[in-house]
């Protein structure tokens, strides 16, 4: 199973604040951005560097740069938008695409309503952002769409994952690496993660 739980005191602290039901939208947004940045620090280990010569104030030396122009960031709308700024702080030259997917409340199936991507090549490293990996249907659908547009190296970055959703993604997309802040207990009968943090999109945009 290609899942990496980023175990760090700062992430645990900030995630606990996000889980609290009385955390307001302003703080929730800030915490989501901060945790995404911390997870992305680990997830970006897969980016290759190239050697170059630079000049310090004292002498010439060799250094390393990453080619973040080969990086594509794709948040799943709506809630994935709240993660974009966090990873873009680390990779400011990355290209950004968007996928619009919602989960039908009756069937729990993923429905695509929007997709717009920058150029994706064989060398691209694509980060798909989805705060909650619950049933897995939205992430599976998004990964399917991204692959159809040429993505070969894909990393799914999520805040909280369920065992059920993680297993489904691994079955459908065994080549995709998952990074998360927490692997939670289970799903409830409505497809929400327990203990989770509720509906990330609603808390992010104050739509309920």
From Swiss-Prot:
5-phospho-alpha-D-ribose 1-diphosphate binds at residues 78, 103, 130-138, 199. This is Uracil phosphoribosyltransferase. It catalyses: UMP + diphosphate = 5-phospho-alpha-D-ribose 1-diphosphate + uracil. Pathway: Pyrimidine metabolism; UMP biosynthesis via salvage pathway; UMP from uracil: step 1/1. Keywords: Allosteric enzyme, Glycosyltransferase, GTP-binding, Magnesium, Nucleotide-binding, Transferase. HAMAP family: Upp_B (MF_01218_B). Pfam families: UPRTase. GO terms for biological process: UMP salvage; uracil salvage. Its EC number is 2.4.2.9.
């Amino acid at each position: 199973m290609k899942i990496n739980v980023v175990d760090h005191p700062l992430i645990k602290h900030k995630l606990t604040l996000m889980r609290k039901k009385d955390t307001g939208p302003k703080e929730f947004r800030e915490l989501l951005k901060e945790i995404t940045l911390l997870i992305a620090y680990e997830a970006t280990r897969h980016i290759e560097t190239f050697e170059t010569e630079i000049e310090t104030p004292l002498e010439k030396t060799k250094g390393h740069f990453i080619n973040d122009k080969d990086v594509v960031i794709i948040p799943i709308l709506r809630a994935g938008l709240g993660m974009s700024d966090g990873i873009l702080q680390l990779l400011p030259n990355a290209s950004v695409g968007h996928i619009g997917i919602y989960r039908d409340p009756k069937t729990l199936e993923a429905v695509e309503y929007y997709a717009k991507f920058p150029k994706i090549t064989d060398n691209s490293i694509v980060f798909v952002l989805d705060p909650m990996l619950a049933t897995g249907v939205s992430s599976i659908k998004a990964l399917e769409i991204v692959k159809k547009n040429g993505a070969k190296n894909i990393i799914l970055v999520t805040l909280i994952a369920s065992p059920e959703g993680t297993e489904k993604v691994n079955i459908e997309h065994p080549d995709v690496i998952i990074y998360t802040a927490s692997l939670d207990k289970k799903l409830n009968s409505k497809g929400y993660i327990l203990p989770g943090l509720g509906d990330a999109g609603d808390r992010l945009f104050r739509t309920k």
